[in-house]
A protein has these predicted regions:
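Flexible beta-alpha connector loops of hexameric P-loop NTPases
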Residues: 1-4, 35-50, 77-88
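Helical hairpin unit composed of two closely spaced alpha helices linked by a short loop
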Residues: 23-69
Length: 186
């Protein structure tokens, strides 16, 4: 929980925690908040993220624990019709994509549909206003409470999608009750 933590300082802390408490997982929330060594004199953030990414991979191997690194997406996803995130949407991503053994992306279509709510019909409105809102509501009902966990990269396995139940009130993801709706191979 230290802003501006360098990858070297993170490594030192993780080693100490492993030695004292036998940690089994390192979580970085989020990757772009870490800093490199500062040796990048030209201020190239992509190169700095590459250094951080390699450092996290080395840390995982050294401590023999998984490192879960959260990352921001670039804004490119917002300019597409299909808002499902892709590997290329990872901000400053070339090395993240290359170094990671697995990349998981979350997608909630409900989030985007909610942002497109048409005018709510009021008495006296044209039939089209009622129809547009009814179509929107049906589309929202179709995806309400459902999210996708996209396995975009898995070095030692297959990729695809897993549908999950999303409970916004608690920001909680869980299995869907109906197992037949869960998996989607792409």
């Amino acid at each position: 929980d230290t802003p501006g933590l360098t990858i070297a300082a993170l490594r030192t802390r993780a080693r100490r925690l492993k030695r004292r408490h036998g940690i089994g997982l390192v979580v970085v929330d989020y990757l772009q908040l870490l800093q490199g060594s500062g040796r990048q004199s030209d201020g190239n953030r992509v190169q700095e993220i590459s250094e951080i990414s390699r450092g996290l991979k080395t840390l995982a191997k050294e401590l023999n624990v998984p490192v879960l690194a959260l990352s921001q997406l670039s804004r490119a996803v917002e300019s597409r019709d299909d808002k499902r995130p892709q590997l290329s949407d990872l901000r400053e991503s070339g090395s993240i994509e290359q170094d990671a053994a697995m990349v998981l992306l979350l997608f909630r279509e409900e989030y985007y549909i909610l942002s497109r709510e048409p005018k709510r019909p009021i008495e006296g409105d044209d039939v089209k206003v009622y129809d547009d809102h009814a179509k929107w509501a049906a589309e929202l009902d179709r995806v309400a409470g459902i999210s996708e966990l996209i396995v975009a990269k898995q070095r030692h396995g297959s990729t695809g999608k897993v549908r999950l139940h999303f409970e916004a009130k608690f920001t909680k993801f869980s299995d869907l009750a109906d197992e037949s709706q869960r998996y989607d191979d792409d």
